[in-house]
Amino acid sequence: MIKFNFVPIFNGTLMKTIGKNKSSHQMRKQLLMLMMIAGLTMAAQVPLDSCRNMALRNNKAILIANEKINAAGYQRSEAKSAYLPALDLQATYLYNQKNISLIAEDALLPTKSFNPATGGYDFNILTDPTGKPVMVNGQPVPSQVALLPKSALTYDIHNVFAGALTLTQPVYFGGKIKAMNEITRYAEDLAKAMRNKAMEDVVYQVDAAYWQVVSLRAKHDLAESYVQLLDTLNYNVNAMVKQGVATKADALSVAVKLNEANVDLTKVKNGLALSRMLLAQLCGLPSTTVMTLADEGKQQIDDTSMPATTYNMDDVYARRQDLNALQLGAKIYEQKAKVEMASMLPQLAVMGMYSVSNPNSFNGYANKFAGAFSVGAVLKVPLWHWGGNYNKYRAARTEAVIKNIEIADARDKIELQVNQASFKTQEAVKTRFATMSNLEKANENLRIAKVGFKEGVMPVDNVMAAHTAWLKANSEAIDAQIDVLLCNVYLSKVLGTMKY
């Protein structure tokens, strides 16, 4: 077990200096003892606010919620960038095993000559002595041909390079870009609301664990006092048995009660140790850490003010983080419906591009780099999708309606929570006053029983009954006091006024 907030007042340098003085062995021992005593006695008491702060700093759920806020912020920045032009660079390299040839072999092409008689160009046809064209397989034979070599139509594409720098500017996307920006803004607010709700939950858990430790510590002290009372009674009864003024049965009855009290004390010790472990874990400390709480050992913690009976529910709704999260969720679904509506509207974007390639064909085919600018627009108009896009829109609208119904249901439940918490707090305060009055009577009853037993006019059974009533009254007073504190914490939680 380690003691929380152990405060050393001597550092290692001072200890080394003392250690060098061999002639002051006794002084070193005294200083070491002083250091140990000072370190132990200066262990600070931990108030409730410190436990809350440690839990808020170390709680994993809150750390995750903070990262979700960061992620939502990044997504919002991403959505804003959709308003701006996008600039992209694309480059491609392609290796081809073979070249491209448009003809399989050298080609012979027929030629034409100008005919003054017709004023046009006629094919140069081979004619016989009679002047008729020579025909082969039904086709005239040209008298002259032009050679088109295969190499002239063979292109080197072994290494192909291409690249493009493209600038795209959205002009109209049916309101989709604006809706996405609204979604990300609401999503960031939603992440913050969920973080705040997680913080409220952690604070409530820490408060419950803190007051549980205080309660069990008070019951531990009460159990020890009860054991001491019974131990004194047991001693007195045994002395009376020896004097013959009490029976053996009286002594056995007291001994049984004493054993039961010791068993109860052990149970309280175990419960207190487990409660301290839970509190340390909630604070982000090792479970073996022992913290001395500021409210431990206090005889009375005054917090018995009667709560209000009516509240402005509109103010409560505005402060509740869970309701705020639901409202933001409904807004997100409303924007999602707009996104689906945008899928049924035209989309227009303009673009500019500079492309370069090697080989290129801008001025004949050449194996070198060359490029050109291009400017254009892209228009997309949805025409017919068999109702698919419209059904997506209707589904999104339905989700928004569901969220609004959930909000109305949450409002009803919050109002019920507030009324129940207020009623429970009022009853806890009334119970607290009743237990305080009962405790005064139990203390007086125990005092009278002790006096009567001492004077010999009160039997042992009545004395033990007075002890039992005193124990019960004190235990109920402790429970009532802690219950008032926890009810006030829960009431502040449901009202949205919890401070942390």
Positions of predicted regions on the chain:
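Small/polar (Gly/Ser/Thr/Ala-rich) solvent-exposed segments
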Residues: L63, L87-S101, K150-H158, T168-K197, ...
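Periplasmic alpha-helical coiled-coil/stalk elements that build and connect Gram-negative outer-membrane
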Residues: Y74, A193-D315, K424, A428, ...
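Acidic, low-complexity, intrinsically disordered peripheral segments
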Residues: D88, Y95-D122, M277, S287, ...
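Bacterial Sec-dependent N-terminal signal peptides
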Residues: M1-N59, K499-Y500
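Small/polar, glycine/serine/threonine/aspartate-rich low-complexity segments that form flexible
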Residues: Q90-T166, E296-M306, K338, M351-V381
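Amphipathic alpha-helical coiled-coil segments
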Residues: I64-A79, A198, Y204-D221, A239, ...
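Bacterial Sec-pathway N-terminal export signals of envelope proteins
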Residues: A43-S101, S287, L293-K331, L383, ...
